[in-house]
Amino acid sequence: MPYQPANSGGTSGGSKAAAKMAQLKFWNKQNSSKQQQQDKDKDAADGGNNTSGGGTGSNSNGDAKSEAKNGKRNWLHTPEQLISGHAVYLVKFFGNLSVDQPKGIEVVKEAIRKLQFAQQMKKAETGTQEKFKKLEITISIKGVAIQEPRTHKILHQFPLYNISYCADEKGVKKFFSFIAKTVKTQDGSDPTSNGHANGNGDGSAKVEESHECFVFISNKLASDITLTIGQAFDLAYRKYMDSTEKTNLSKAQQQINHLQQTVNVYKERLREVSAKLPKAELDALLFNLGIKDILEAPTTEPQNGIEVASEALSNGKLDDDKLLIDTNSTTASTHSASPSSFLPIVPPRNNLSSQISIGGKSNSQKMDELLLNSDSDSDFDPRADETQEIGGTGRSAISNMFGFEPANSFGQHLFSNNNDHKLQNNNSSLLITSNNNSINSSGFSSELNITPPLLAPPPKIAAPRRLNSVTTGNGLNGNTDLFGSDPFELNNGPNIFKQNQLNLDDFSLESLDPLRK
C-alpha cells in the first residue's frame, strides 16, 4: 500500500486514486522489465552486443564468431583515428604478474584471483584498503602504452605483435586484462619499455623472455577497451598486408630491371665476340642455330596446340617433327587423349599392320621389287597370258608337249611361293598381325609378307598348249605325253615308233616353234 499523507483524511476518493497510481506503477515496471528482456534476447540473437570482447583473445567467442560470420563488426572508432592518432582510456591499475601460458581465459581468471588475494592480504596486514592508481591506456595501430595522466610518463609500452591475449571478464564487468611478452635481463633489471632488451651491443648481457598479465579496473569501459584493441589489431594487419604487397611488387620490379641490365651487358659482349669471328664461321653457326641474327632469341610465350596447328596449315608446310600421329611410337594414343593437343583419332591397331605392310614401304624396297620384277631375259615368257587356275587353289599347271616343266626363274619362284603362302594362310596372318607386339617388330614380318608392286605385276606362269581332251584313233589322249615321263628315257619313246602310231605328217617343224601359238 503506497504512503498516504496525513492531511488526506483517508477519503474514499483519495484511496481510489492512490490504488490506481500504484497499479500503473506496477504495470510500468512490469512492462519495462519485459522490454529489457526482449532487448537482451534480440541483442543475443543478432550478435551485436557491444560489450563483447573484440581483442585477440576475447572470452566471448560466440559473439565474435557470429560477427565474423555476418561479415561486419561494430567498431567504436574510425580507422583514421587509430591509424593517424590514438584512443585514450582512463582506468585504475589493479596489478600485473607473470603467467605460464601466453593466452587463455583461465589464465586471466587465475591471475585476477591471485591479485585479489594479494590485495586482501595487504588489507588484513595494514587494516586499510589500498587505493588503486589511475593510469591512461593509449591504443593505436602501433601498440598499447600505459602512462601517467598528468606527467604522461610511460610506464609500460608494448607493440601489438607482443600482445598475445586480450579479454574482459564477463563475470565481473569491471576487470579488463591483456597478456604481453616482456624481455628481462638476467641480472634482474626491470623489463624494457618496448618489449625488447636494451643490450649494450657486445652481446654479453643475456635476456629472458616471459609473459605477464596486466589487469585494470574500469566500471563501464572494460568491453570498449577490449573492442578498441581488437580494431587496432585488424587495422594493423590490413596495413601490413598492403605494405607487404607493395614491397614484394617493388622487389620484383627491381629484379626485372636488374635482369634487363644484365641481358643488355651480355648482348653487348656477344656482339663484340661475334665481330671477331670470320664471316663464314658466323654464317655457319647461324644456319645451324636456325636464326638470322646472333642476338636473336626464341620466344618463350606458351602456345596451345590449336594455334600451332592453324599456323602450320595456313603456311602450307608441316615439319616432320610436328606430325599429328607418330606411328613408330606406342604412346600415340596416350598423347592423342590429352586435351591440350589437337590430334585426330588414332586408327585401330588391327588394321594398322596391313596399312604398314602395303603402304609403309620405303623407296628402296619399292625399287628393289621393280628391279626384281622387270622383264629381263631370264623372266621372259612368251606364253605369259595363257594361264588357267586349276581346282581354285591359285596354282597353274604347266605341261609341255615334251612332258616336263621348265625351271622357274628367281622372280617366279619368289612370287609363286609368296602368293601360295599368303593364300593358304590368309586367316592365320590376319590373326597374327592384329597383335600390337607384331607391329613393333614389323621390320622382320614385313620382309616375309612382300606382295607384288602395283605397277609391275608378277609374271604369269605358262599354260599348256592343248587343254582339250582329244582322243585319237589309236586310243591315245591328246594330253598324253608322247615321249613318256622322261624325254631322255629310251624305254618309253621307241615303243611308240615301233607300233607305227606316230607319223611324221602329223605335225610340222613350225608347230615345234615355242614362239608361235
From Swiss-Prot:
Disrupted-gene phenotype: Embryonic hemocytes display a reduced level of apoptotic cell phagocytosis. Larval hemocytes display reduced bacterial phagocytosis. RNAi-mediated knockdown in muscle leads to an increase in the number of ghost synaptic boutons but does not affect the deposition of presynaptic debris while RNAi-mediated knockdown in glia leads to a significant increase in presynaptic debris deposition but does not affect the number of ghost boutons.
Residue stretches of biased makeup (Polar residues): 185-197
Pfam families: PID (PF00640)
Bias-annotated ranges (Low complexity): 1-19
A GO term from the CC aspect: cytoplasm
Post-translational modification Phosphothreonine, affected residues: 480
Its job: Plays a role in axon pruning in larval mushroom body neurons during metamorphosis. Plays a role in the infiltration of glial cell processes into mushroom body lobes and the subsequent engulfment of degenerating axon branches. Involved in Drpr-mediated phagocytosis of apoptotic cells. Required for bacterial phagocytosis. During neuromuscular junction development, required for the clearance of pruned ghost boutons and presynaptic debris and for normal synaptic growth.
Oligomer status and interactors: May interact with Drpr.
Keyword Repressor included in the entry's annotation: no
Gene3D superfamilies: Pleckstrin-homology domain (PH domain)/Phosphotyrosine-binding domain (PTB) (2.30.29.30)
SUPFAM superfamilies according to UniProt: PH domain-like
Family classification: Belongs to the ced-6 family.
Keyword annotations of the record: Cytoplasm, Developmental protein, Phagocytosis, Phosphoprotein
Subcellular location: Cytoplasm
Protein's recorded name: PTB domain-containing adapter protein ced-6
PROSITE patterns registered for this protein in UniProt: PID
Region listing for Disordered, in residue ranges: 1-70, 185-205, 374-393
Gene Ontology biological-process entries: apoptotic cell clearance; mushroom body development; neuron remodeling
Sites of Phosphoserine modification: 338, 374, 376, 378, 469
Cell membrane listed as a keyword: no
Domain PID span(s) in chain numbering: 83-265
CDD domains membership: PTB_CED-6
InterPro entries, A to Z: Adapter_Engulfment-Domain, PH-like_dom_sf, PTB/PI_dom
Species, as recorded: Drosophila melanogaster (Fruit fly)
